Regions:
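Contiguous, non-catalytic segments that form substrate-binding/exosite surfaces or channel walls
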Residues: 101-252
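Secondary-structure capping and boundary motifs in well-ordered enzyme cores
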Residues: 39, 100, 127-130, 170, ...
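All-alpha helical catalytic cores of prenyl diphosphate-utilizing isoprenoid enzymes
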Residues: 171, 175-178, 203-207, 213-227, ...
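A well-structured
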Residues: 1-160, 486-490
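Active-site recognition of the HExxH zinc-binding catalytic motif
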Residues: 254-273, 291-295
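Divalent metal-coordination and catalytic microenvironments
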Residues: 7, 143, 261, 294, ...
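C-terminal, non-catalytic "cap/extension" segments appended to globular domains
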Residues: 3, 25, 29, 35, ...
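Post-HExxH zinc-binding segment in Zn-dependent metallohydrolases
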Residues: 283-324
Length: 490
């Protein structure tokens, strides 16, 4: 058995433990009773340490050196590249830091659920201080090894090849045209007569509708399921994908589009190359590409007028109000409104929420600001970008997201990168597919075949730039995103 084959076998062993960690994490968020938190945190930390020790076994260094010298096919070279990247990412961190970070993150995240509801910044800040400190330690270790800034080192975990210099350029450009576009869209919509949700929408009916929409989007229910959690997410593994949403019985909008969004993530996972399962090359390319798939479903498909016709038809099976008329649904789902909450934000204001978080987490990881500065900075940027004050309103301000509670610094840019990639994929798809006609037909297979051929089946065999260029003929071009927004909202 050559060194490459030994590395693949080892990778699959690590993936099996990762599988368990994913399912246990889903259980913690979706069904675990609150009294189980402490013991669960300890168990998960132990499992993470075991995975880390497997990924950093001393003999792996020799295996990688030997494999580099072996004659490998192009696909095997890509597999080796991705296995080595995972190994290097893990090998940089001491086991003690991995364990401490896992414990601090679990403790902070679990307490945050109640603290956020109570607007308890003081209580949250005590736990979060440790998460930030450990994240900064991790960032510095990664930065020293890679010769980058601490934030760029964290960004590299989620977005290989992306830098804050590139993001600064992209986001600075967005900031030149987004505020006026938001204001123009709001002004244009003033005459819209929208019937907003105003009634009782039982959670079980919302779930039944959501399941029908997932079926329309060809979710594979033999390899996945829908549940409920505080924060919607997609977890699990490609053969057992777990998506969640949350229900508010006074409205239906967030649960429905939340399901469409998470189904996009799930279809990507379910469509990853099965022959590469258990290896890093068989995983999603980056979080930006992952978000491009959820946002392709939610924004490019989900807000398409032909798709909204389907939503109206399916909703009539469960609800009878005029708010579910197709013209009204279209207005609801393209309504532009400046709001506090990122996950409830419309397509147009969403990038402002992401840019705000990016700028704060970049400066926090780089040591430019302290964690105690965050509420004030958040308020300043919300006022500057969306004209809203969050002073004293931590629940709807800096405490609203789950990401920072466990130290996931460097993730937020993925959302707007994803929206940009999604717009570019749609522009490319429209060159060969009558997208509106396909959606209208109710059989969306041609759309999913394109996504499978160009994105899902590639796993991480290509770099992000290679993947995007092969699929669309060019690397990331944010002009497609701007053109899409102008076309829809002006």
């Amino acid at each position: 058995m050559n060194a490459f084959t030994k590395l693949v076998e080892h990778s699959k062993k690590v993936a099996n433990f990762g599988h368990l960690l994913e399912i246990v994490g889903w259980d913690q968020a979706a069904v675990m009773p609150s009294g189980g938190a402490e013991a669960r945190s300890n168990a998960m930390a132990e499992l993470e340490v075991h995975i880390h020790s497997l990924m950093t076994q001393p003999h792996l260094e020799d295996l990688f050196a030997q494999a580099e010298e072996e004659t490998l096919a192009t696909q095997e070279r890509a597999m080796l590249r991705e296995m080595k990247r995972e190994w290097q990412l893990a090998n940089l961190l001491p086991e003690s830091l991995v364990q401490a970070s896992s414990l601090a993150g679990s403790k902070c995240e679990h307490a945050w659920r109640a603290q956020r509801a109570n607007n308890d910044w003081a209580g949250f800040e005590k736990n979060w201080a440790e998460v930030v400190k450990l994240s900064q330690e991790e960032a510095q270790i990664r930065a020293d090894a890679n010769g980058t800034t601490p934030y760029d080192a964290m960004l590299n975990v989620y977005e290989p090849g992306m830098t804050s210099a590139s993001l600064d350029t992209l986001f600075s450009d967005v900031k030149t045209w987004l505020p006026s576009l938001i204001d123009e869209a709001i002004e244009k919509q003033k005459s819209n007569n929208i019937l907003l949700p105003n009634g009782h929408y039982p959670a079980e009916k919302q779930k039944a509708l959501g399941l029908q929409v997932m079926k329309l989007l060809q979710f594979d229910f033999e390899h996945g399921r829908l549940d409920e959690s505080v924060h919607p997410f997609c977890g699990g593994v490609p053969t057992d994908v777990r998506i969640t949403t949350r229900y508010d019985e006074s409205e239906f909008m967030q649960s429905l589009m939340g399901i469409v969004h998470e189904t996009g993530h799930a279809r990507y996972e379910q469509g990853l190359p099965k022959e590469l399962a258990g290896t890093p090359a068989g995983e999603a390319r980056s979080m930006g590409i992952h978000e491009s798939q959820s946002l392709f479903f939610e924004m490019q498909i989900g807000r398409n007028n032909a798709f909204i016709d389907h939503l109206a038809r399916l909703a009539s099976n469960h609800f009878s109000g005029n708010e579910f008329a197709k013209d009204n649904l279209a207005k609801i789902y393209t309504r532009v409104e400046k709001g506090f909450i990122r996950v409830d934000a419309d397509e147009l204001t969403y990038p402002a929420h992401v840019i705000l978080r990016y700028e704060i987490e970049r400066d926090l990881m780089n040591g430019v600001i302290k964690h105690t500065d965050v509420p004030e900075l958040w308020n300043e940027k919300m006022k500057a970008y969306l004209g809203l004050s969050t002073e004293g309103n931590f629940k709807n301000g800096c405490m609203q997201d789950i990401h920072w509670t466990d130290g996931s610094f460097g993730y937020f840019p993925s959302y707007t990168l994803g929206a940009m990639y999604a717009a570019q994929f749609m522009a490319a798809m429209k060159k060969t597919i009558d997208v509106d006609g396909v959606i209208q037909s109710g059989d969306l297979s041609p759309i999913f075949t394109w996504l499978s051929d160009n994105i899902w089946s590639k796993g991480s065999l290509l770099t992000t730039d290679e993947l995007v260029k092969q699929a669309t003929g060019e690397t990331l071009n944010a002009q497609h995103f701007q053109a899409h927004l102008k076309s829809r909202y002006l």
